[in-house]
Structure formats: C-alpha cells, structure tokens
Amino acid sequence: MTDTRNGEDNGKLLYCSFCGKSQHEVRKLIAGPSVFICDECVDLCNDIIREEVQEAQAESSAHKLPSPKEISGILDQYVIGQERAKKVLAVAVYNHYKRLNQRDKKNDDVELGKSNILLIGPTGSGKTLLAETLARLLNVPFTIADATTLTEAGYVGEDVENIIQKLLQKCDYDVEKAQMGIVYIDEIDKISRKSDNPSITRDVSGEGVQQALLKLIEGTVASVPPQGGRKHPQQEFLQVDTRNILFICGGAFSGLEKVIQNRSTRGGIGFNAEVRSKEEGKKVGESLREVEPDDLVKFGLIPEFVGRLPVLATLDELDEAALIQILTEPKNALTKQYAKLFEMEGVDLEFRTDALKSVARRALERKTGARGLRSILEGVLLDTMYEIPSQSDVSKVVIDESVIDGTSKPLLIYENSEPPAKVAPDA
C-alpha cells in the first residue's frame, strides 16, 4: 500500500514503509534501499527489543539461582557474624526459589510447600539488613512492613493488604513480579497477645492482626486497589496470589529468653533445690538458640501463626569485636561511607584503632547494637563536616579515642604545613 502511494506520488512525497505516515507527519524519515522508516517506528522497535531482552534476562536469572554457599558468601560481604542465621536463610531462600522453578513443570505429583522465615534477635543485630541483602542479591521485589502500624480491617490503621500494595509499588504494579517477591515484616513481636486469657475487649493490634496475617502468609488471593487508591465497592481490584511470596518476619522478642530459661531450668524448693548464682545465667543469644514453638506461644503468638513460620533463625548479640568489624569490614562499612564523603572534598579521613574501640563501647552502652553506630559517628563528625567545605587547605582528618570521648577535636592536617595542636572543645 505504501509502495503504491509512493509510486503514485513519483517520489515527491515520502511515506514510512511500516506505518504509512508521510514525511510531514513525523519528525524524521530514514531512507534505506527503496524503503523508509520514521522515528516513531524506530522507537517502537527499540521498545520491543528492550522488552524481549529484559524477559530473556529475567528467565536466565531465574535459572541461575546461586547455591546456598554462594548466598551465604554474598551475605558475608555485608553482614558481620550471625553465621547460623545466614546458613538458615540461605537454605530457606534457595529452596523457596527452587520450588518456584519447579511449579512450571507439568506431570509432577509432588507439590512443594512454602517455608516462611522467623528471625529472632536483639535490636541492631542485622535482621533487616539480612533481608534487604537477600532481596538485592536475588533481584526480586522487596518491601518492609512495620507490624506495629497494622490493625484489623475496619479499625484505624493499616490493613494487612497494605503490605501487598507496598510490594506492588516496588515493581510498578507488575502483578507477576510481585507474586515472586519477598516481604519483611518487622517488629512482629509487638503484635503478640496482650494476655493469655481471652478478654471481652478486642485486641485489634495484637491477636487480631495475627489472625488477619494468617491467610496472607499461608497463601491467598489478596484484593489490592490499583495505584494505591482507597477501597470502594465500584472499584476494580488487582488480584495478587500470595502463595509464592516469601514472608520473613523479624522481631527482638524482648523477654523471650526468660520464657526459655524458665522452661529449661529445673525448679525446686527446700534443701534439694539447685542453687544457681547470677553469673551462671546465659547470654540472651545463647538462650534464644534453644527457642521452641511452645515458647513463642507463651510469649503471645497464637499457635496457628507460629505454624506458618516453620523456618526459625536466631541472631546473637553483637559484642565489641563484632561492632568494630561492622565499622570497617563490610562493603558499605560506616567508616568507608564517611571516608567517601570526605574524599569528595579532597580530604582523607583516618580512624585510629582506639577510636573504633571507643565507638563500639559507646554503642554497647546504648544497647542499640549496630544501629547506634551511625548516630555516634554523626555526632562526632558533625562540626568537622560543617567546617571542611569552607577550608581548601585541609588534606587529612584524624579521629582518635579522645575525639570520641569528647575531650578534644579531630586532628586536622593541612597541606604544606605542620599540623596544629589539638584544641579542647568549647564548653
């Protein structure tokens, strides 16, 4: 058709050989051997090729699932310690995505079940970081939900379906991608039952939320408003099947170690009672390793909810040595991050060993784990980061223990000059 029109016009007016638009209807017309293509058709062809390449890459990445050892090795680059938790997570995630690859095969009588994960560990021990690193490694949609904001449907607060809505937002509302994603629900211990005895008052943010999460975690078809709109009866919903979404729940479970110790410690009174000193008490991390489902039920989780989280991983408390490693060794270690910030100003940043030890000790005193390290360094480096951009002759900043303790200012080394004496901070 286009060739005929071109022939009739005797070459005076040119047309795209693909869409038939004339040279006046498009911005650019590219000539080939007896054919023409417009800029719009070129863009369309590029989009088609790009989509096919992305689909092929997604399929190849799905088949190239890293082994548990490889997963654990990559986690080692970002998370210090917690070897047992890494091993449990690596095996669970590997089996989960192996199960997803298996579901496409027909004539298979064995149906593999889903194994969701429960992470138990003190605050700042690396629960959220482990989940984030896993999602980045596997290149799947990932979202973090806060269990403390969830309430039963009909009450003020977030419905459990909002979790799936957040997951959809992470993948531009691609339902197929979302159905293979990972959801991390933080502070799961905060929705424990407030009391062992049933009450006439509704526990809308405790046991009620656990009941609402049951079907979502096990596998159901959740109805989610498109593009984050509010629910109303005349609206069409996106249907998301949660059977293949991996749920990882994490919490500090403060006080759980006492429940475990009460179960594992022989009681007694009188002359035959076993006498124990305070020094014989176990560390929190050691006690948590002995956790059993009954302990979680006594803590306040309902038995059905515990049953939906068959894979259990406990994290240890971080000691001073581990905190120093966290400051220096991971790919995105805090000292490397601040060194990069100073490098952008053309300044070297050096942390002395005694300074790192002092930072770790202060974090232990605050009982915030690795999460408290950044706030300590921010406070220490605030004045220096304020002054450095205004000084062009500083070549190096040195931080030692006295700077962390607040008894002196950072040592500034200037270009082509002797370093100035330290000056005590202003009162």
UniProtKB/Swiss-Prot annotation:
Superkingdom of origin: Bacteria
GO CC field: HslUV protease complex
SMART domains, alphabetized: AAA (SM00382), ClpB_D2-small (SM01086), zf-C4_ClpX (SM00994)
Binding locations of ATP: 122-129
InterPro entries referenced in this protein's UniProt entry, alphabetically: AAA+_ATPase, ATP-dep_Clp_protease_ClpX, ATPase_AAA_core, Clp_ATPase_C, Clp_protease_ATP-bd_su_ClpX, ClpX_bact, P-loop_NTPase, Znf_CppX_C4
Functional description taken from the UniProt entry: ATP-dependent specificity component of the Clp protease. It directs the protease to specific substrates. Can perform chaperone functions in the absence of ClpP.
Protein name: ATP-dependent Clp protease ATP-binding subunit ClpX
Organism: Pseudomonas syringae pv. syringae (strain B728a)
High-level lineage: Bacteria, Pseudomonadati, Pseudomonadota, Gammaproteobacteria, Pseudomonadales
Gene name of the encoded protein: clpX
